[in-house]
Each structure stands twice: as C-alpha cells, then as structure tokens.
Amino acid sequence: MIVHAVPDEPDFPGDIDRVKMESPRKFFSTINANVGEVMRHTDKNVASVAAREAMRLYRCGLLFDHDYDDNDSTKLYCSELVERAYLRAGVSLAEKRRHDFAVPGFHFEHVIMPSDIYESSQLKTISRF
C-alpha cells in the first residue's frame, strides 16, 4: 500500500483532499501517472520506521495542506508527508532544500518539492516504468 497526500483526486463524491492510502495499482494507474519510480531508503530499519509513521499519519485522517505550510502539522502536502515520516526515523531526505515561489494569486515559502526528496542520496531505485 502507498500512503500519500494529493489534491483533487476524490475517491467518492464529496470526498475531501486528504492523506490517503491506495494500492500500487491505483496509485500508479495511467489515470494518475504517466511514468513512475519506486525508491526505497538504503537502510531497511529507517524505511520501516518511516512506513509506520506514514501509516500513523494516514490513520490520523489529516487533510491536504493547500497552503503548503510545513509549520502547520495539522495538514500535510505530498512531499511534507514523506519528509515528516522519515524525520520520525531520524533522517531528512530533503535536507535543507526548500523553495519560495509565486504563482498567480499565491505565494509559497519554504516548500519541499518532490524533486528535493528525489535527489536524496539516501534513496535507491527499485523500479522505473
């Protein structure tokens, strides 16, 4: 199973944006993704602790953080969820990488981008498709 946070992918009418858990088949469905990659931490113990923390966060029923505010632990965005799970294991995948950017009508500060986690030397690729 894959725990993740995503906006605008409701599972049923009236579903809210939240931390979700889905099968790999659904997560990597061509409806949701054109390409994919499975990566794991090089230390199995770290990966195990991070996985348990991701499950705990899922069970909390946290909403998706549309403000992309990593100072607010009551809501999580996608990369923040991954970083928080690994921090519980004592590891930062994003390290100090953060971004400030603006899009029309919004200004975001200190955001962890997916590429910040992807660039971690602590992860190894298991599969690409």
Where do the PLM segments sit?
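Activation targets extended, charge/polar-rich intrinsically disordered C-terminal tails
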Residues: H66-F129
